[in-house]
C-alpha cells in the first residue's frame, strides 16, 4: 500500500507518461499544420443534431501538453509541500480532476460538452480554494464561486442563442448582426473566468488555496480558460464591430490596475497573482489588437515562468512555516541558492528580458502595437504597464535576495530534490520555450519594420522600471518602504484593486447588513421585547405581587376586607 505522501508522486509519473505519449503527435500536427476533427452523431432534437465532437489541432494539442507537463511538475512539488497534510489523496484527485476539466475545455468544440469542462473548472476550483476550511478560505471560495457562476450563466445563454443556428459547434458560427448578444455573453463569460475588470477581485482571494493549486490555476488552467475560449471563438467574435475596441479597453484597464496593485502588495502569493492578472490583460490586449495567435503564444510561454514563480514562492513559504509575508524573507541566496536563482530567472522572463521566454511573446505584442495603427492612449498605457511589471518584479526579487533576514533563528531552510527538480525543469522551459515556439509555431506574423527607438522602447521601459525599483529600495528602509506606499489613501486604493474588492463583495452586503442590524436593535431587541415577552413578564409580575400582597393574613387586611364586604352589602340592600 502506498504511503499517503507518495500519492502525488504516482500522479506525477502518470502525467509524465501522458505527456510523453502526447509529445510526438503534437509535434507532427504542428509540423503539418493540420487538424483532425472527430464527430459522432448521437441523436437529433427537432432537426438539430446532437453531436459529440473532438478536435485535435496544433493549438489544442500544444496547450494540452503544456497543462500536463506543468501538472506533472506541480504534483512532484506537492510531495514535499503537502507531505504533512492528512488528505493528500483527496488533494491529488482534485488536481487530476482539474486537469481533466481543462482538457475537456480544450478538445471539445461543442458548446454543451464544453460547458462540462467549464463548470468542472469552477466546481473543482471552489473545492480547492476552501481546502483548508478556515474563515478566510470559505470567504474566498464564496466570492470565487459566485463570480464564476456569472460566467456559467453567460455560457448557458450562449448555448440557448446558438440553437438558432441549428448546431452548437463553435467552429461553424455564423457571423451575422443578429448574433451580437451572443458575442457579448461569450465575452463576459471569458472576462469572469480570466478575472478581467470588473470581475478581478476573486483572483487574489483565490490565493487561500494551497500553493500547488495556485501554481496550476495561474499558469495553465482556470484563469487561462477565458483566454482560450476567446481564441476558439475569435473568428466569430472578430466579425462584431465593437469587439476589438471593447476588449482592448478592458484588457488595458486590467493590466494597469494589476500592475499598480502589485507594486504596493506585501503578500508573496498575491503579488504573483496580480502579475498573472497583468499578463492575462496583455493576452486580451493582443486579441484586441487583432493578434489571437500572439495571445496564444504568450499564454504558453507565460504558463512556464508563472508556474516556476509559484513553485519558488511555495519553496520559500514551506521553509518559513507557511508565512507568505515578504517581510519575513530576505538574504536567502546562501541558504536557498537554487530556489533564488530560479526565482530571478522567472522574474526576468516575466519582465521580458532579452532571450528569455517572455521576451519572444510579450515584446512582440508590444512591437506589434507600435507597428499597427491603434489608439495612442491605449498603446501608452500598455507601455506604462510594461514598466510597472519590471518595477514590482525587481522589488520582489530584491526583497528576497538583498533585504535583511527577518525570520526566526530556528527556521530550517532546505532544498530537497522534490523541490528543486520541478524548479530546474520549469526554469529550463522558461528560458528555451520562447525561442523554440517561434521555430515550430505557425505564427503568421508579418515582418514589422519599425524605427530603432521604437524597437528599443520596451527594453528601455523594463530597464527604467527596474532602476526605479532599485532606487526606491536602496534609498529607504527596505523592510518597510518597499512593501507599501506611504500615503494611506493611495495605499488603500491600490491594495483594494481600485476599490474592486469592497465594491464586488462588501458593497452588495453592507447595506442589507446595516438595515438588518438596525431592524434587530429597533424591533427584536427593543419594541417587540418591550411589548412582547418582557412587557408581559413585567405586567404579570406586578399583578402577581399585588395579588400575593392581598393574601397576607394580617388583622389590618381582615378589617379592610370586612369593611369592604359590609359596604358592598349595604349598597346592594339599598
Curated annotation (Swiss-Prot):
Signal peptide: none
Subcellular location: Mitochondrion inner membrane
Membrane topology listed for this record: Multi-pass membrane protein
Catalytic function, reaction form: a ubiquinone + NADH + 5 H(+)(in) = a ubiquinol + NAD(+) + 4 H(+)(out)
Keywords of this entry: Electron transport, Membrane, Mitochondrion, Mitochondrion inner membrane, NAD, Respiratory chain, Translocase, Transmembrane, Transmembrane helix, Transport, Ubiquinone
A single MF term (Gene Ontology): NADH dehydrogenase (ubiquinone) activity
EC number: 7.1.1.2
Chief place of localization: mitochondrion
GO-annotated biological processes: ATP synthesis coupled electron transport; electron transport coupled proton transport
Transmembrane segments: 10-30, 50-70, 87-107, 111-131, 141-161, 181-203, 211-231, 240-260, 280-300, 301-321, 340-360, 381-401, 423-443, 458-478, 489-509, 554-574
Task performed by this protein: Core subunit of the mitochondrial membrane respiratory chain NADH dehydrogenase (Complex I) that is believed to belong to the minimal assembly required for catalysis. Complex I functions in the transfer of electrons from NADH to the respiratory chain. The immediate electron acceptor for the enzyme is believed to be ubiquinone.
Family according to the record: Belongs to the complex I subunit 5 family.
Name the UniProt record assigns to this protein: NADH-ubiquinone oxidoreductase chain 5
Gene name tied to this protein: ND5
Amino acid at each position: 500500500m502506498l504511503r499517503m505522501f507518495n500519492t502525488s508522486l504516482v500522479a506525477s509519473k502518470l502525467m509524465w507518461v501522458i505527456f510523453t505519449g502526447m509529445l510526438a503527435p503534437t509535434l507532427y500536427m504542428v509540423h503539418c499544420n493540420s487538424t483532425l476533427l472527430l464527430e459522432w452523431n448521437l441523436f437529433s432534437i427537432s432537426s438539430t443534431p446532437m453531436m459529440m465532437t473532438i478536435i485535435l489541432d496544433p493549438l489544442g494539442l500544444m496547450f494540452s501538453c503544456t497543462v500536463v507537463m506543468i501538472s506533472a511538475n506541480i504534483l512532484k512539488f506537492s510531495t514535499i509541500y503537502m507531505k504533512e497534510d492528512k488528505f493528500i489523496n483527496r488533494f491529488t484527485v482534485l488536481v487530476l480532476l482539474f486537469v481533466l476539466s481543462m482538457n475537456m475545455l480544450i478538445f471539445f468544440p461543442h458548446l454543451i460538452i464544453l460547458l462540462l469542462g467549464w463548470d468542472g473548472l469552477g466546481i473543482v476550483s471552489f473545492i480547492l480554494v476552501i481546502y483548508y476550511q478556515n474563515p478566510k478560505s470559505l470567504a474566498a471560495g464564496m466570492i470565487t464561486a459566485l463570480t464564476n457562476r456569472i460566467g456559467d450563466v453567460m455560457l448557458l445563454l450562449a448555448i440557448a442563442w446558438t440553437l438558432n443556428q441549428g448546431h452548437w459547434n463553435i467552429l461553424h458560427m455564423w457571423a451575422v448582426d443578429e448574433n451580437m448578444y451572443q458575442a457579448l455573453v461569450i465575452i463576459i463569460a471569458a472576462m469572469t473566468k480570466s478575472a478581467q475588470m470588473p470581475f478581478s477581485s476573486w483572483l487574489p482571494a483565490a490565493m487561500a488555496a494551497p500553493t500547488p493549486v495556485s501554481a496550476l490555476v495561474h499558469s495553465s488552467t482556470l484563469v487561462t480558460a477565458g483566454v482560450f475560449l476567446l481564441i476558439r471563438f475569435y473568428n466569430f467574435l472578430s466579425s462584431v464591430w465593437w469587439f476589438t475596441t471593447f476588449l482592448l479597453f478592458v484588457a488595458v484597464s486590467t493590466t494597469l490596475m494589476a500592475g499598480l496593485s502589485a507594486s504596493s502588495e506585501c503578500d508573496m502569493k498575491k503579488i504573483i497573482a496580480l502579475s498573472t492578472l497583468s499578463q492575462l490583460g496583455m493576452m486580451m490586449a493582443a486579441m484586441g489588437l487583432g493578434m489571437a495567435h500572439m495571445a496564444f503564444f504568450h499564454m504558453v510561454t507565460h504558463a512556464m515562468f508563472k508556474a516556476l514563480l509559484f513553485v519558488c514562492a511555495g519553496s520559500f513559504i514551506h521553509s518559513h512555516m507557511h508565512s507568505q509575508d515578504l517581510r519575513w524573507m530576505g538574504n536567502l541566496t546562501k541558504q536557498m541558492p537554487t530556489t533564488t536563482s530560479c526565482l530571478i530567472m522567472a522574474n526576468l522572463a516575466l519582465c521580458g528580458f532579452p532571450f528569455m521566454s517572455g521576451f519572444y511573446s510579450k515584446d512582440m505584442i508590444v512591437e506589434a502595437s507600435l507597428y499597427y495603427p491603434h489608439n495612442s492612449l491605449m498603446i501608452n498605457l500598455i507601455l506604462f504597464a510594461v514598466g510597472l511589471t519590471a518595477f514590482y518584479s525587481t522589488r520582489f526579487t530584491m526583497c528576497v535576495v538583498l533585504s535583511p533576514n527577518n525570520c526566526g533563528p530556528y527556521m530550517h531552510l532546505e532544498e530537497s530534490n522534490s523541490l528543486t527538480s520541478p524548479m530546474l525543469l520549469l526554469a529550463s522551459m522558461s528560458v528555451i520555450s520562447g525561442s523554440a515556439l517561434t521555430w515550430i509555431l505557425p505564427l503568421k506574423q508579418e515582418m514589422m519594420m519599425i524605427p530603432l527607438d521604437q524597437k528599443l522602447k520596451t527594453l528601455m521601459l523594463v530597464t527604467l522600471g527596474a532602476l526605479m525599483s532599485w532606487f526606491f529600495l536602496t534609498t529607504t528602509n527596505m523592510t518597510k518602504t518597499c512593501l507599501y506606499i506611504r500615503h494611506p489613501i493611495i495605499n488603500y486604493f491600490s491594495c483594494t484593486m481600485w476599490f474592486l474588492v469592497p465594491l464586488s463583495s462588501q458593497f452588495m452586503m453592507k447595506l442589507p447588513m446595516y438595515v438588518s442590524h438596525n431592524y434587530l436593535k429597533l424591533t427584536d431587541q427593543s419594541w417587540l421585547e418591550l411589548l412582547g415577552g418582557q412587557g408581559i413578564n413585567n405586567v404579570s409580575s406586578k399583578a402577581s405581587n399585588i395579588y400575593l400582597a392581598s393574601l397576607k393574613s394580617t388583622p389590618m387586611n381582615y378589617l379592610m376586607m370586612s369593611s369592604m364586604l359590609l359596604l358592598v352589602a349595604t349598597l346592594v340592600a339599598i
